[in-house]
Amino acid sequence: MAEVTFAKLYKNVVEDFRGDIFIEYFENGNKVQWSKEKFMQITDSLSAYFAERLKNVKKGTWVGICCDNSPYWVSIFFALEKCGYCVAMLNCSFTAEQVNSFSKNLGIEAVIEDNYERAEKLDVKELIMTDDLKKVSVNSEYNTSDEYWETKTAFVTSGTTSNSKLYVFSAESITEQIYYITAQKHAYDKMYGDKIHRFLQILPLRHCLGFGTAMALWVFGYTAFFPDNIGVLTIIDTIRKADINYMVGVPAIWKAIFSVVRIKTKSKVITEQSFRAVMGDSLLSGICSGAKAEETLIRDFRNLSLEIINGWGMTETGIAMVGFFSDNTSYNYTGKILKGSDYKVAFEDENGNISESGTGELLINGNCLYSAVLTEEGLVPRKDEWFHTGDIFENIDADYYFKGRCKSVIITDSGENLYPEELEESFCEILSDVPQFCIACYQNCPVLFIYAPEAEKTVLEEKIRCQNQELMPDKRIAGVFISENPLPVTTKGESSRFKLAEFFESNKKYFNTIILQKGKLNL
């Protein structure tokens, strides 16, 4: 049987699109519309352009897309896959050093770029700017058969050069995931599916959540609207002006919207009336996922007629669970495993026992997971074994309830997984003379705990602040807690990471606290 290529996803999403307008956006204040036919013409033209421009780049190798969302992003993706290149979706917030690191380890010889300053520092054979692609004449036709379409792509998690990770997915896996998402009849009916016409594309298409939800919404026949930027005021203005019915966002985006509603209506409580006064009447439904939604945010949703989908997934697993906040009264309810998918789910308790029900760390296996991960030794295929998600869930009659994170993982408000051990490496050099230091989770934020009786506190604070600013925003610690007394340790003599929050709460008067990010910690 022939291997599934991205031609199948292209057919399902684009060729079989049943709506009238595929993409919309504002340009110089005027609305621009792309029909399905125009989108396909642009994709074919870019395919012809890439076939000539990348003729010295071997087919079957990797090409990086390192650019922000734009109406052209998806055309670029499909055009490259159509030409026989595997697309690596790089984080557009990466530095040139990070892009070069991935290019070297993955063998990337060409990069599609939209940042001229970063582009000057890239070390690749072919560098193509998105501004040049927008000038490609839309009259070329690139004929290809399925044998030239590629079979894989890769999502890259954000982070520093040392800890960013790249996961490869097969075209078959992604196509199946999109199919199972769109096959949820209950979800379609509950989200007012037949009344939705236009969704706002604000999540990065390079991310599995942004990519997967956009593809699924196109399968439903909805128009994707690309805003000028993703500032909260622009989002609100676009929802009103462009008649947006659906929006996918992480909790931080929804919280920002509700904050504006509260300010503009001078009301602490979100009501249907106050929400519509600011947002208008067009928004009917949406998704709030990518991170755990706080109880206050869920209460705000429940005060509205909006039907908001919760859910769960990771870069490594794609979208695995789907559920509505209104389906269950529990604030910890996450949803059900995607029906029909190839996911196998189990739990591992604190003693290492694995079972199919109960409470414990969520384990997942199946073809819907990533197929390979990039290491310093190159791409390493995933073994057919349980993948440890780092999340604790309880399974009650196939309903999944989020109970917390595994001890070593911190999840940020924007949905990023932070690994304390990796963060500590960033501070090792400047804290080499400190007797004890450890990064732990406090109020869902990474905090640096220190015991340094002999250190000059002012100098130490300045070093930490400078080092923290060197990290990407989602990787920065929220504060520093300097203790007058030794930190608790394990039987191995190591700082007891999982007792630090409790230790701080019981001994606050012996701590000097330094806030590094305003609004993150409530002290």
Descriptions of predicted regions:
Residues 19-21, 135-156, 162-163, 189-198:
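Conserved pre-ATP/AMP-binding loop-to-beta segment of ANL
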Residues 394, 410, 438-441, 466-523:
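Conserved C-terminal "lid"/linker of ANL adenylate-forming enzymes
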Residues 32, 49-94, 201-202:
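Conserved AMP-binding/adenylate-forming
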Residues 361-417, 441:
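Conserved ATP-binding/catalytic segment of the ANL
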Residues 33-36, 152-179:
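Conserved AMP-binding A3 loop
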Residues 175-198, 205-274:
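Conserved AMP-binding/adenylation subdomain of ANL enzymes
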Residues 225-227, 297-360, 364, 369-372, ...:
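Conserved ATP-binding loop and adjacent catalytic segment of the adenylate-forming AMP-binding
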Residues 245-249, 258-330:
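Gly/Ser/Thr-rich phosphate-binding loop
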